[in-house]
Amino acid sequence: MFFVNQYIMTKQTDGTQKLTKAAYDRDTLYKAQAEFHRRQGNAMDASDTIWTLCMIIDEDGAVYASEKAVKPAEPETEA
């Protein structure tokens, strides 16, 4: 399980920027992770344990992601 805060950044008429909380979108999340890894020169694969904690998408579609490495939780077993 992981938590995601996703925001859309838009420019206002007065030149300021506004962040609006957006709906969770798994496909966009994974694309943001892959792009983050590409820019860092690292490959992203199924063994990654890095989850996006916050990402911002600007009006041009650019995605900014803040990431933190975490260990995945052990799967729960049913008794």
Regions found by a protein language model. Give the residues of each.
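Short aromatic-glycine-(Arg/Gly/Cys) micro-motifs in beta-strand/loop hairpins
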Residues: M1-K21, I50
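Intrinsically disordered, low-complexity regions enriched in small/polar residues
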Residues: V4-N5, M9, R26, R38, ...
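Generic structural motif
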Residues: M9-K11, D27-L29, E59-D60
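A short, charged, amphipathic alpha-helix used as a generic interaction element across diverse proteins
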Residues: T16-Q17, D25-W51
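Short, mixed-charge low-complexity intrinsically disordered segments
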Residues: K21, G41-A79
